Amino acid sequence: MSRTSTSVAASAKSQTIERAALILTYFSAEEPRKTLADLARQLDLSQSTAYRYIATLQAAGLLERDEQRGGYRLGPRVIELSFIALNQIEVRKHALDEMDRLRDRLNVMVNLAILVEGDVLHIAHAVPADWPRWYTAVGRRAVAHCTALGKTLLAHRPWDEVRATVERYGWRPYTSRSIQDFDRLAAELETIREQGYSIDSGERNQGTTCLAAPIRDHSGSVVAALSVSSKAERLTDAFREESLPHVRETADRIAFRLGYLGGTGYL
């Protein structure tokens, strides 16, 4: 095979992999099922060409046909890969027991998240026994600057990076309380850095309040955020004042497990 033929074959293979990967990214919590027409349109391909990529993903267990509702959904192999990926996140390994203890102490939902492409990605939850199990889900994403978890993470990133991220992905407000201008965002992130915690009062969901603190790794870098959340009427000012030390101490205990040795209330 000539160099030109080899180059063309490699390019075609690369394009195939890229398009197959793109198909997987088109599925979301809001759109868990896609028709062949949906995927062909998003790929800007004919349905016959799109189907070849879908068939390849089906064969690998990454997509499956939804026989009851029609269309396609993510396949069982994705669940297996997600489990593997979750178990490789170091902060999650060290956080789970601490999150359970915090949940039992305060009787609120406890959340753990990391920053991904301008969003927070939830990687663990500890839910009180009397809460509905469908209320939350690992893998859920939310706009970072609209959540206490996200603002905590953004507060420890360079401002130029934060601004560039928002400019790239947009404000995407959830409620009238969501931050939608750079001056307010910059001021709030500075306050969060100074006080060491963040509050979301109806910025993600009206009627819900969230309180978050940063988690550092052995180098001192903020790698995740921990939060407690509940109905706004439950997280009163008095309850926040009572619960904040426990939230920060739990975050510090997780950081200690990650090898962080300085500047924590726990130490």
Question: What role is predicted for each listed range?
Answer:
Residues 63-65, 112-113, 215:
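A structural signal for short hydrophobic beta-strand segments in well-ordered beta-sheet cores
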Residues 180-250, 266-267:
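Extended hydrophobic
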Residues 68-169:
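Amphipathic alpha-helical effector-binding/dimerization core
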Residues 161-164, 170-173, 248-267:
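Cysteine/selenocysteine-centered motifs that mediate thiol-based redox chemistry or coordinate metal-sulfur cofactors
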Residues 2-93, 100, 253-260:
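N-terminal helix-turn-helix
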Residues 101-102, 110, 172-178, 194-202:
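Short helix-to-loop capping/linker segments positioned immediately adjacent to catalytic or ligand/cofactor-binding
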Residues 13-17, 36, 71, 75, ...:
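Short, structured helix-loop boundary elements
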